[in-house]
């Protein structure tokens, strides 16, 4: 899990080790509670353009100006018509959610250019709040990949 910031972020990053430890502890406890086989790791805050997505099978960036590709379509294209592997199968998927003001078009273009596995996706007709978009996207992924 990358904690990134971009041009339109209202809150600027704080490099506090205690927060990083807390976030990793929360991720571990949540994974244990939900019966996940793999525990997500939370990394330090970094600029979106500095994030390295090379180790991921797919990278989906939720972009409010994406009009053609939904998350479902991008998943099918990335992993075939059959549903992708479940947690046990080991697909590594990165999701990128924008800040309160949305992404700058150049930020989206940079991620798509620098990450071969990246795809810009729509989460629907409505623009969601940052905190809602992340949960909505994770719920969509769970539904599509885990049935």
Where do the PLM segments sit?
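Short beta-strand/loop segments at the ligand-binding rim of alpha/beta enzyme cores
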Residues: 36-39, 90-94
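A mid-sequence, solvent-exposed acidic-amphipathic segment
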Residues: 44-87, 93-96
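Short glycine/serine/threonine-biased micro-segments
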Residues: 33, 96-100, 122, 132
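RNA substrate-binding interface of SAM-dependent RNA methyltransferases
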Residues: 2-61
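Short glycine-/acidic-enriched loop or helix-start segments at secondary-structure transitions
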Residues: 11-12, 71-72, 105-108
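Short Gly/Pro-enriched loop/turn and capping motifs at secondary-structure junctions
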Residues: 66-68, 100-104, 127-128
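A C-terminal functional module that forms or caps the active site or interfaces directly
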Residues: 92-112
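Structured adenosyl-cofactor binding patch, chiefly the S-adenosyl-L-methionine
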Residues: 105-147
């Amino acid at each position: 899990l990358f904690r990134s910031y971009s041009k339109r972020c209202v809150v600027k990053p704080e490099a506090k080790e205690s927060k990083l430890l807390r976030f990793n502890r929360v991720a571990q406890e949540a994974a244990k509670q939900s019966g996940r086989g793999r525990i997500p790791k939370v990394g330090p805050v970094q600029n979106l353009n500095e994030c390295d997505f090379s180790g991921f099978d797919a990278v989906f960036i939720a972009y409010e100006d994406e009009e053609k590709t939904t998350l479902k379509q991008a998943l099918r294209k990335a992993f075939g018509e059959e549903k992708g592997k479940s947690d046990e199968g080991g697909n590594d998927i990165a999701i990128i959610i924008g800040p309160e003001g949305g992404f700058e078009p150049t930020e989206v273009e940079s991620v798509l250019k620098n990450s071969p596995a990246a795809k810009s996706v729509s989460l629907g007709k409505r623009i969601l709040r940052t905190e809602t978009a992340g949960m909505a996207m994770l719920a969509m992924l769970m539904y599509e990949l885990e049935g």
